[in-house]
Regions:
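Short linear motifs in intrinsically disordered
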Residues: 80-85, 99-101, 140-149
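Positively charged n-region of N-terminal signal peptides that target proteins for export
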Residues: 1-4
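Lipid interaction determinants
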Residues: 21-79, 87-136
Length: 185
């Protein structure tokens, strides 16, 4: 009789835990997000955070950190597609296993690095605002930053709002459309 009672108590526990925590493929987190602010124990002297973008491609479980390689703030390798997983409110980057809590508020994403207790002052929070670029502006499958392009300066304004030195460079960064000339600030 005791075994039957224990079995009746254990079975609901087993079934209540199964299948409730699914991998999040949040469709609302899609496309261009522009960095607005960073909160950390670090110093940014009049830094323009909006030069940095994060692009989400949930159908492919990919994201791309875009910005100036020499002066950018990135959560992944700059301008290269990276696999990710969102599970139970945590964004995990496959390439380096860094984890961030992710909070989605209407047109805003807040990423907070999950602190490593063995490292002092590694707390950092990124606040991104939804951008206006078309979802098909960047194709992560077309990114090939190892493409050899000429150094000719023939600037183009990419659909992502960045000025690229020439059309070849824009295409190698996965930009699907651009206009001749520099982007206006």
């Amino acid at each position: 009789m005791k075994k039957l009672i224990i079995l009746l108590l254990v079975i609901p526990l087993v079934f209540s835990c199964s299948g409730t925590d699914e991998v999040s493929k949040t469709a609302e987190i899609k496309g261009q997000y522009i960095l607005q602010n960073v909160s950390c124990l670090c110093y940014f002297d009049n830094y323009d955070f909006t030069k940095n973008q994060l692009w989400f491609f949930p159908e492919q479980d990919m994201l791309v950190s875009k910005g100036d390689i020499s002066d950018g703030i990135f959560i992944t390798k700059p301008n290269e597609p990276s696999k990710f997983l969102i599970y139970d409110g945590v964004l995990t980057l496959n390439e380096n296993e860094k984890e961030y809590t992710i909070e989605v508020k209407q047109n805003e994403i807040i990423l907070t690095y999950i602190d490593n207790p063995e490292i002092a002052d590694d707390e950092i929070t990124y606040i991104f605002k939804k951008g206006n670029a078309s979802l098909d502006c960047i194709n992560p499958k077309d990114i090939s930053i190892d493409t050899v392009c000429t150094k000719e300066y023939d600037p183009v304004c990419g659909c992502d709002g960045y000025t690229y030195s020439n059309p070849c460079v824009a295409k190698s960064y996965g930009v699907s459309s651009y206009k001749m000339g520099e982007c206006s600030s």
